[in-house]
C-alpha cells in the first residue's frame, strides 16, 4: 500500500457515508498530499431490516464487516458512530481516535405535534431503541411504541406516510444530513438520557499500523474522549451492547466530569438511575463506579430479562 493512501471502510447508509466523508475531508485538510479512498459495504445490521434490532442479536451489528476488511488489509481505517461500537475489539484492531462530538440529544420529529408531552393518548411513536422506549413509556405509558428500522430517510418516509404520529431520532444524524428543519423539538438529556457515545464519531484501525495512527492523530478531540470513555466504561461494566435499555451521558465543566446513567425496563415500569461526579481524568473509574451502583440497585435483573428475550 502506498504511503500516501488511506482506505476507509464505511457502511453505505447516507449518514455513514457523511461520517466517512467528514473524516476524509479532515485527513486531507491536515495532510494535503494524502489520497483518501472510501470502501462502502453493507453490514448485518443494514441487511436485516424486518426484525427489531434487540432481537437480531449480537454486538457489533454495524461494524463486523468493516473490521474484517481491515484485518484482511482491504481497508486501513473504519469510521463508526460511537454508539454502535462494541466494547470489545478483534485482536489486532482498536479504537484509535474519537472526534469532536456533535449534539448528543435525541430529537422529536412529528408533522402534527410539537413534543412528546403534546401527543394525544394512544399516539404511535416509532423507535428501534429500547433505551428510548423505556424512557418514553416511563413518562407516557399511554403511548404506543412501535419498531422503526432503516436509514434516516426511510424512517422519515414512514412518518410522512402516516405510519407513526411521531418518531425519535438522534439529533446529530439529522444535523449532519442537513435535515435539521425536520426536528420538531430537541429532547433534553433530562427527558431522555442519550446512548453512550451518541453524537460522537470514532475511528478504528490496526493497532500495529503506526503510519495510519500518525496520520489520524490530529483528528482526536480530548474532551470528547473523556466523556465517551466514562459512558462506555459504564456500559461495558453493565455488559451492555448497543441494543439495551441503557442511557449514559457525561458532561465536563472546569475539568470536572458529571456522568449520569440509567437502566430501564423496556416497558417503562422501572427506571434505575444515578449520577457520579469526579475529575475528568478518572473518567473510566467513574463509569465503573456508576455501573456498580446501578447493579446494586437492581439493574442486573432488568438486563438479564432483556437478554433472555
UniProtKB/Swiss-Prot annotation:
Disulfide bonds: none annotated. One of its GO terms (biological process) is protoporphyrinogen IX biosynthetic process. Pathway: Porphyrin-containing compound metabolism; protoporphyrin-IX biosynthesis; coproporphyrinogen-III from 5-aminolevulinate: step 2/4. Its EC number is 2.5.1.61. Keywords: Porphyrin biosynthesis, Transferase. InterPro entries: HemC, Porphobilin_deaminase_cofac_BS, Porphobilin_deaminase_N, Porphobilinogen_deaminase_C, Porphobilinogen_deaminase_C_sf. One of its GO terms (cellular component) is cytoplasm. One of its GO terms (molecular function) is hydroxymethylbilane synthase activity. SUPFAM superfamilies: Periplasmic binding protein-like II, Porphobilinogen deaminase (hydroxymethylbilane synthase), C-terminal domain. PROSITE patterns: PORPHOBILINOGEN_DEAM. The keyword Transferase applies. Binds 1 dipyrromethane group covalently. Its cofactor is dipyrromethane. The modification S-(dipyrrolylmethanemethyl)cysteine is found at residue 242. It catalyses: 4 porphobilinogen + H2O = hydroxymethylbilane + 4 NH4(+). It comes from the Bacteria. Tetrapolymerization of the monopyrrole PBG into the hydroxymethylbilane pre-uroporphyrinogen in several discrete steps. Monomer. Belongs to the HMBS family. The porphobilinogen subunits are added to the dipyrromethane group. This is Porphobilinogen deaminase.
Amino acid at each position: 500500500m502506498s504511503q500516501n493512501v488511506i482506505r476507509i471502510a464505511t457502511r453505505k447508509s447516507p449518514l455513514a457515508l457523511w461520517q466517512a466523508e467528514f473524516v476524509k475531508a479532515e485527513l486531507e485538510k491536515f495532510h494535503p498530499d494524502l489520497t483518501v479512498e472510501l470502501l462502502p459495504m453493507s453490514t448485518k445490521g443494514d441487511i436485516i431490516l424486518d426484525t427489531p434490532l434487540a432481537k437480531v442479536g449480537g454486538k457489533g451489528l454495524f461494524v463486523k464487516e468493516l473490521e474484517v476488511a481491515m484485518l484482511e488489509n482491504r481497508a486501513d481505517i473504519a469510521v463508526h458512530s460511537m454508539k454502535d461500537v462494541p466494547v470489545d475489539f478483534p485482536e489486532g484492531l482498536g479504537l484509535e481516535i474519537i472526534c469532536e462530538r456533535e449534539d448528543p440529544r435525541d430529537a422529536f420529529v412529528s408533522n402534527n405535534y410539537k413534543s412528546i408531552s403534546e401527543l394525544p393518548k394512544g399516539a404511535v411513536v416509532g423507535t428501534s431503541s429500547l433505551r428510548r422506549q423505556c424512557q418514553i413509556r416511563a413518562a407516557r405509558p399511554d403511548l404506543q411504541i412501535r419498531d422503526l428500522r432503516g436509514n434516516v430517510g426511510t424512517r422519515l418516509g414512514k412518518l410522512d406516510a402516516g405510519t407513526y404520529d411521531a418518531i425519535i431520532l438522534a439529533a446529530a444524524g439529522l444535523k449532519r444530513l442537513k435535515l435539521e428543519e425536520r426536528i420538531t423539538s430537541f429532547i433534553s438529556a433530562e427527558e431522555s438520557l442519550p446512548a453512550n457515545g451518541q453524537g460522537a464519531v470514532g475511528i478504528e484501525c490496526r493497532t500495529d499500523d503506526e503510519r495510519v495512527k500518525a496520520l489520524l492523530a490530529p483528528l482526536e478531540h480530548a474532551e470528547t474522549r473523556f466523556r465517551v470513555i466514562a459512558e462506555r466504561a459504564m456500559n461495558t461494566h453493565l455488559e451492555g451492547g448497543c441494543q439495551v435499555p441503557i442511557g449514559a451521558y457525561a458532561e465536563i465543566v472546569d475539568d470536572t466530569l458529571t456522568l449520569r446513567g440509567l437502566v430501564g425496563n423496556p416497558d417503562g415500569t422501572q427506571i434505575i438511575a444515578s449520577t457520579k461526579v469526579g475529575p475528568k481524568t478518572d473518567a473510566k473509574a467513574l463509569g465503573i463506579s456508576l455501573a456498580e451502583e446501578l447493579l446494586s440497585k437492581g439493574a442486573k435483573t432488568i438486563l438479564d430479562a432483556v437478554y433472555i428475550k
